[in-house]
């Protein structure tokens, strides 16, 4: 009888010890499942709350902005009422000219006047002075101002004294005054330095200006001074 009772107690204890871990882990797994479900349900809720807060902030800022714009518009409206500007009506150029020609418009403003092609004759000429010379008519023509061509051979010319004038001659192909006009150059003649700036020796020479002295006058451009 005692053995049987002991055996039953042992079996009951073994069964209880075997079921205890299973019950513990079963409750833990269930708790974890509940926690995970609650977390998944809470995350979208929090996102929605944050979005709602941002949206509310945006709406508030928008209302403040619109209030400022409205206040500014009212302020400018009050300024315009205090100092109104004059509005001008815009007319089309084409329509205004077609509806009201220029001559009619001028007649309304200035009254009927004389015709445009009729003017009173002057009592006397504007320039009654007989010594008055019309500058247009007195302008010289090309025929009057035509340059005279120099003679082929110019007479000997007396050059001015000083270092700014010397004698020059032409090249061999163009002799005389014509050669100088066509581009002869100042050449050193067979003259002493003292004879420079004096009478030109030959008939085919000119006086040529220069800023140099003596032999430095060679190959300067020849410019006729006087004949």
UniProtKB/Swiss-Prot annotation:
Q: Which cysteines are joined by disulfide bonds?
A: 159-207, 167-200, 168-186, 208-222
Secretion signal, residue range per the UniProt entry: 1-18
Main subcellular location of this protein, as a coarse class? secreted
Its induction note reads:
Expression is increased during sporulation. Expression up-regulated by carbon or nitrogen starvation.
Q: What happens when the gene is disrupted?
A: When the four class I hydrophobins (hcf-1 to -4) are partially silenced, approximately 10 times fewer conidia are produced an the germination efficiency of conidia is reduced by about 50%.
Highest taxon in the source lineage = Eukaryota
The answer to whether the entry has keyword 4Fe-4S is: no
| Annotated glycan sites | 190, 219
Q: Please list the tissues where expression of this protein has been recorded.
A: Expressed in conidia and aerial hyphae.
Query: Keywords, A to Z?
Result: Cell wall, Conidiation, Disulfide bond, Glycoprotein, Secreted, Signal, Sporulation
Compartment list = Secreted; Secreted, Cell wall
Question: Could you describe the subunit structure of this protein?
Answer: Self-assembles to form functional amyloid fibrils called rodlets. Self-assembly into fibrillar rodlets occurs spontaneously at hydrophobic:hydrophilic interfaces and the rodlets further associate laterally to form amphipathic monolayers.
Describe the family membership recorded for this protein in Swiss-Prot or TrEMBL: Belongs to the fungal hydrophobin family.
Describe its function.
Aerial growth, conidiation, and dispersal of filamentous fungi in the environment rely upon a capability of their secreting small amphipathic proteins called hydrophobins (HPBs) with low sequence identity. Class I can self-assemble into an outermost layer of rodlet bundles on aerial cell surfaces, conferring cellular hydrophobicity that supports fungal growth, development and dispersal; whereas Class II form highly ordered films at water-air interfaces through intermolecular interactions but contribute nothing to the rodlet structure.
- What name does the UniProt record give this protein? Class I hydrophobin 4
The organism named in the record is: Passalora fulva (Tomato leaf mold)
Cite the source lineage: Eukaryota, Fungi, Dikarya, Ascomycota, Pezizomycotina
């Amino acid at each position: 009888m005692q053995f049987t009772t002991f055996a039953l107690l042992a079996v009951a204890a073994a069964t209880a010890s075997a079921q205890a871990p299973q019950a513990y882990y079963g409750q833990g797994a269930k708790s974890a499942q509940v926690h995970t479900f609650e977390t998944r349900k809470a995350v979208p809720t929090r996102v929605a709350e944050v979005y709602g807060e941002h949206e509310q902030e945006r709406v508030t800022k928008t209302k403040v902005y619109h209030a400022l714009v409205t206040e500014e518009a009212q302020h400018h409206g009050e300024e315009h009422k205090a100092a109104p500007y004059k509005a001008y009506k815009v007319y089309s150029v084409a329509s205004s000219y077609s509806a009201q020609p220029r001559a009619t418009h001028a007649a309304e403003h200035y009254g009927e006047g004389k015709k445009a092609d009729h003017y009173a004759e002057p009592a006397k000429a504007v320039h009654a002075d007989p010594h008055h010379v019309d500058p247009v008519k007195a302008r010289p023509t090309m025929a009057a101002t035509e340059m005279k061509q120099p003679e082929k051979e110019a007479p000997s010319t007396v050059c001015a004294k000083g270092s700014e004038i010397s004698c020059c001659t032409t090249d061999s192909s163009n002799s005389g005054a014509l050669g100088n006009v066509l581009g002869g150059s100042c050449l050193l003649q067979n003259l002493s330095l003292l004879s420079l700036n004096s009478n030109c020796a030959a008939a085919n020479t000119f006086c040529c200006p220069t800023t140099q002295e003596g032999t430095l006058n060679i190959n300067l451009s020849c410019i006729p001074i006087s004949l």
